[in-house]
Regions:
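Extreme N-terminal starter segment of soluble prokaryotic enzymes
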Residues: 1-3
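Acetyl-CoA-dependent GNAT
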Residues: 5-86, 97-99, 103, 135-138, ...
Length: 158
């Protein structure tokens, strides 16, 4: 398995993979899927230019995707992690996360953050194994800094 940093030249591949991820996660009736289904090549290329997109290839088939962007000079935010249902449980998420974290290190980031659904035990386990910890809301000490069903987690890079 190999991680690929997608570039603007890969926009067709990215579009197909992203739409596959949305269809699997939310269904084709979802508003986000319908919106992105109508994206032009220019819109897909812009996404690849503005945020880092990493895909994982397994025997010539893309089986996972993660997005990352520099939230501030010292911070990277990861989002939209997806693995193909047929590839789950084979280390795809961990491999993609590691690539995105390494990208953050190369940028000089000292913190990586992400959000995860509170009931996604598989994802929580992977994040915790990689060293991510729940981020407390400084105002009330709760573990919720986003929507009620999501948990914000962070990883401190050395």
């Amino acid at each position: 398995m190999g991680v690929i940093r997608l570039t603007e030249a890969d926009w067709r591949l990215f579009a197909a993979l992203r739409l596959r991820a949305l269809a699997d996660s939310s269904g084709t009736d979802d508003a986000e899927y319908r919106t992105e289904m109508s994206f032009t090549g220019t819109q897909w290329r812009r996404r690849l230019r503005v945020h880092a997109q990493f895909a994982l290839a397994d025997e010539e088939r893309l089986v996972g995707l993660i997005a990352a962007h520099r939230a501030s000079p010292g911070s990277v935010y990861l989002y939209s992690l997806w693995t193909d249902p047929m590839a789950r449980g084979r280390g795809v998420a961990r491999t993609l996360l590691t690539a995105a974290i390494d990208w953050g290190r190369e940028l000089g980031a000292h913190t990586v953050t992400l959000r995860v659904h509170r009931n996604n035990a598989a994802a929580l386990g992977v994040y915790q194994d990689l060293g991510f910890v729940a981020t407390a809301n400084p105002a009330d000490g709760s573990q919720n800094t986003g929507p009620a069903d999501e948990l914000t987690m962070s990883l401190t890079l050395s």
